[in-house]
Amino acid sequence: MNTRSLAIAWLACLLVLFEVRGGLASFPQLNLILPRGVQRGGERELVFQGARLKDAEQIFFYSSDPFEVRKLEVVDDNTIKVLLMIPDNVSLGEHLVQIRTRSGISEYRSFMVGALPVVDEKEQNGSLEEAQAIDMNVTVHGTCENEDVDFFAVKATKGQRISVDIEAMRLGSYLFDPYIAILDKDRFELAAVDDSPAALQDGVLSVLAPEDGTYYIQVRETSYGGNGESRYRLNVGHFPRPTAVYPAGGKAGEPTAVQYLGDAAGPLAQDIAVRAEQGMMKLFPSDSNGICPSAITFRSSPFGNALEQEPNQEINAANPVDATLSLNGIIGQPGDVDCFKFAAKKGQVFDVECFARRIRSGLDPVINIYYADGRSIAGNDDSRGPDAYIRFQVPEDAEYVIRVTDHLGRGQVDFVYRIELQPIVPSLTLSIPRIDRYSQTRQTIFVPRGNRFAVLLNASRSNFGGELKLDDSVLPPGMKMVAQNMHASLSQMPVVFEAAADAPIGGKLAKFEASHIDPATGIRGQFQNNADFILGPPNNAVYYNGQVDQLAFAVIEELPFQVEIVQPKAPIVRNGTMQLKVQLKRAEGFKEAVTVEFPFRSPGIGAGSSIQIPAEQNEAVYTLNADGNAAIGTWPIYVIAQGNTPGGPAWASSQLATLEVAEPYTNASLARSACEQGETAQIVCTLAPNKPFE
């Protein structure tokens, strides 16, 4: 990937983006954690940088690993130092954290945990003659300035494995696309890479030393860009660094024999324990020379494995398999095609999911389904991003063939894939819609004492319908939730959280769930969030993100204002308007203007994006309108107010009020008439009552 040509324009856009965000950002704010990674097995100090951190009290860890905060020191409003105890059994790789202060919850950011001791890059090291000598089995913390090239020298004996794994884009802090190479003493490249699918847009390498001697590791930005923010963690050692695992998944809760592929020392066979929880899991292969510093992705699912057997290139040579098993194979050389044959009965429906890029394989899969005689039924390339997906409705009792190959006809020894014929099952996911496309503003629940906070909650139903209810059992002490059940016709609902005046200040991460109104269905789903960590050209494309499955809750200190909706006593009618009165209760001394939003609009209801309650005034009117097809009924409504306080921007919501939408009481029709300019005229209006007035 070449990024230098767009670097100047992108930096300018980035500065504008940060300037815009600054006015909307939630408080407190967490921008960066330094160093970007630490070695497990002891106490480590991390510096959290951001804004409005002076009242920091707690660090939320999204993993279940046994981190222990030994000390939290506030340096100033923009910096805190955290002394962490990181035991030897903490998981390697990325860990997501955020800060709870007495006034709010920050964004979540990442830091890395490694197994190797850390050394710092030392300049000057811009040539082979100046290469920084390092031991094997270390992690180098370095920075690439503009047009900078860093060299590191290591010793190896003939046949020893030299493995290199760089974490740069995966650090999630800056658009730095690294290039790495391994050179011999004569400056010849033994291996080089820009992007490795196993490491996203970072690179991994492993070679066997051809002779005793000194070898050089080169690090630079792929197009010789870089600046002081272009940080990296360079893992160098004798550890295994495969690029794929085969098979790429196993049956949940059962042991599975696998082979790690793509390592210079050859395939590594191991038995692994597949976790009982379904989904993607991380594997860290190890041998007598160490442990792989970053994960190989592996899928835990309800299905056992069927492994391809060559030859299976043609439909008439397809491997016979049971449709209850997952289909595993490798597109091992250019032009390779794999075919599997299975029996199915008319009326069966399968979600045919091909996992390749989602498990970080380099394969860009294309799948097709045929009758066993070769007649085509369906095909797909990219319905799951680069991965393929087909919903297959079996047309008759028969045998069918699934064919898989690479979109460009490529093939490599690590182009693994896994195809699952999944039965149609219901699923449910909750999320909070973004109010700012690239930020985490108001993606957490922070409720001021004696006040309220509200969010819109999205529910993504798949393969089912029906009413949903939320589970409020996970809330912190002193906090309660006010929400109606979500009607089957809706995918979004308002939820108000209230904190008692004496609620203890504190917070937690929790699995926030919803369920079908009928417990017999067993349908449940939980909150998930996906934050953009690195954006870049073109058009603010997302290069790296962070995903979590817990929601952060906190009770925070009191605010100097409260907001209320004056409950409407009459309905809004179709093709009509309503002046919704909003009242502001100010604490003594608080005179700032407050911005009020009306986030939830039932079908057919419109409103402006916001209104202002001017400084030193206590109420305003929000104009609502209903179109001719507005949904009839009684709907929940709320407003949320933002005001500037000495601690930064703050939010409070109103109570959950109701808005009735009704048919007009009368219809009016005007008769055609005419008059001369400057004259008066009478116009006949005919009223037709729709329902009696009360």
Regions found by a protein language model. Name each.
Residues A9-R21:
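Bacterial N-terminal signal peptides
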Residues L24-V69, V75-T79, D88, R102, ...:
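Acidic, Ser/Thr/Pro-rich low-complexity intrinsically disordered segments
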Residues L32-P35, V245-P247, I432, T441-Q443, ...:
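Surface-exposed, proline-enriched loop/turn segments that connect beta strands in immunoglobulin-like
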Residues V82-V90, Q259, D271-V274, L456-S460, ...:
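Extracellular/luminal low-complexity segments enriched in Ser/Thr/Pro
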Residues Y108-S110, G226-R231, G411-V416, A520-N530, ...:
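Beta-sandwich strand segments
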